[in-house]
Amino acid sequence: MAPLTEVGAFLGGLEGLGQQVGSHFLLPPAGERPPLLGERRGALERGARGGPGSVELAHLHGILRRRQLYCRTGFHLQILPDGSVQGTRQDHSLFGILEFISVAVGLVSIRGVDSGLYLGMNGKGELYGSEKLTSECIFREQFEENWYNTYSSNIYKHGDTGRRYFVALNKDGTPRDGARSKRHQKFTHFLPRPVDPERVPELYKDLLVYTG
């Protein structure tokens, strides 16, 4: 199923939310108060309280972009068809071409183009590939001062400190325990890199139109 078809009316069905168009939102009818960012995020988190990770966000509106996700440890994150997540040093690996779907300001889901699986993180801080878009597949995208990004779970954090679980890759390319990873560590620092369609034409055959 196409990601933007699968990502549909969950946010649209939440009361008071405007309609997202590109990177902007249409204003609600005159007289209605536009939603605040905290309310939009809060609605996503409330949707997960019925059982973290089990709530399927099958109708989430979003804007899609394709990138590679390069970690400061020297690896591109990839999602394999068997549901495992690991790093690869190969540039433009098929399993390392990812679709970033913006579901709210600062919130994204990440889907492997070739595997068709969404990046997820469970309550133990373990990364995995999910066939369905659930609340465990929503991450907070934070732009850091060193020009890298961090991605943290939208629902899992330490109860005592409030520190969130972070997506991270070890120095050998294996996924790092998100519960033990911290924002300032290079394991958690990622750089979204552009994708050259000519390097992976098989992933763009339905999008590209060739003219002779």
Curated annotation (Swiss-Prot):
Name of the molecule in the record: Fibroblast growth factor 20
GO CC, alphabetical: cytoplasm; extracellular space
Subcellular location: Secreted
Gene3D superfamilies: 2.80.10.50
Tissue: Preferentially expressed in brain; substantia nigra pars compacta.
GO BP of this protein: cell differentiation; fibroblast growth factor receptor signaling pathway; inner ear auditory receptor cell differentiation; negative regulation of neuron apoptotic process; neurogenesis; positive regulation of cell population proliferation; positive regulation of ERK1 and ERK2 cascade; positive regulation of MAPK cascade
PANTHER family referenced in this protein's UniProt entry, alphabetically: FIBROBLAST GROWTH FACTOR (PTHR11486)
Subunit structure: Homodimer. Interacts with FGFR2 and FGFR4. Affinity between fibroblast growth factors (FGFs) and their receptors is increased by heparan sulfate glycosaminoglycans that function as coreceptors.
Sorted UniProt keywords: Growth factor, Secreted
Family: Belongs to the heparin-binding growth factors family.
Function, as annotated: Neurotrophic factor that regulates central nervous development and function. May play an important role in dopaminergic neurons in the substantia nigra.
Principal cellular location given in the protein's record: secreted
InterPro entries assigned to the protein according to its UniProt record, in alphabetical order: Fibroblast_GF_fam, IL1/FGF
GO molecular function: fibroblast growth factor receptor binding; growth factor activity; receptor-receptor interaction
